Amino acid sequence: MITTLRRSTIALLASSLLLTIGRGATLPFMTIYLTRRFQLEVDVIGYALSLALVVGVLFSMGFGILADRFDKKRYMVWSVLVFILGFSAIPLVNNAPLVVIFFALINCAYSVFSTVLKAWFADRLTAEKKARIFSLNYTILNIGWTVGPPIGTLLVMHSINLPFWLAAACAAFPLVFIQLFLQRDGGAAAQPGAAPWSPSVLLRDRALLWFTCSGLLASSVGGAFASCLSQYVLVVASSDFAEKVVAVVLPVNAAVVVALQYAVGRRLSARNIRPLMTFGTVCFVIGLVGFMFSGASLWAWGISAAIFTLGEVIYAPGEYMLIDHIAPPGMKASYFSAQSLGWLGAAFNPMLTGLILTHLPHWSLFVILIVAIVAAWLMIFRGINARPWQPDSPLANA
């Protein structure tokens, strides 16, 4: 990569790291925060968090699609500003609905930043570099998840509000990085070989439909598993043990990703994506079975999380590369925004988890998640078969 492109890439990777440290210090503890400060029941918390996540995903999709028409640097700056506003406001309000509203703003801002970041990489990097940089970005994000939760745990011991101030402070640095090191662009129209911008194309692409539906189910399993597990443990044990489980599971998850993500992700290709996604599905299933029988053993929770994370290590770059493979030039952000609808699965997870834990046997939660990830795997194959798949395409050489 040329020097300017390398500098911009490093600035964006550093921004991802800092934003994720802030999220890692706060997001896993939202359930505990709402329980302690507002004495909400677990099913009510599920509804509240799901509503915030759904609103965030839907608004971020609209903003993300428009990012193909406008300057991506400006989009990133505004999303980080909203991120800071949301985290600064939560400790200052004493009203649960307002907390949910600001939480929705935070999720919208982060989703927009993430979508535009992926589109920025897809527009500017060669096919060989895309898989490597995305896997490196995902590794860096999980370094943030490794650092964030322990810091959040320490801060919560002193004050339930401190993690939110940390998140706001961490987000201030990306503002500087983006302003100094990112160049403005002219939107999709300025890109050579760009397809005419037409959001209606998204509605006609059957492969995109299958991949988005698959992402919906997969994110319902892996996208919010920390809050899902904390809800589960709150019901079967206590809030104190829930804190311990979150403090074990998230660092284990992040450590496995940091160790394996780059090595595995850079080797994904159109030739081997089918067997690798199958292996990832098996890892998800084994991890979920492990969670079901972990009980009071933190060791069992940690081992199950490690196996579960092997599935995540494969699915994360795999889903990105599937979308990049089918997205035409000039519409990368639009396609990634459509894919972000899949995160509605993670958004609905807290609500569905609350309903399941309230009305069904506790162990049935993991059985339902197993069925969901198997269905997601089947939909990936339907999407691949929806259009001619070229093993020798750029994806194969990534």
Model-derived features: where do they sit?
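Helix-to-loop junctions at the C-terminal end of transmembrane segments
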Residues: 59-71, 260-273, 357
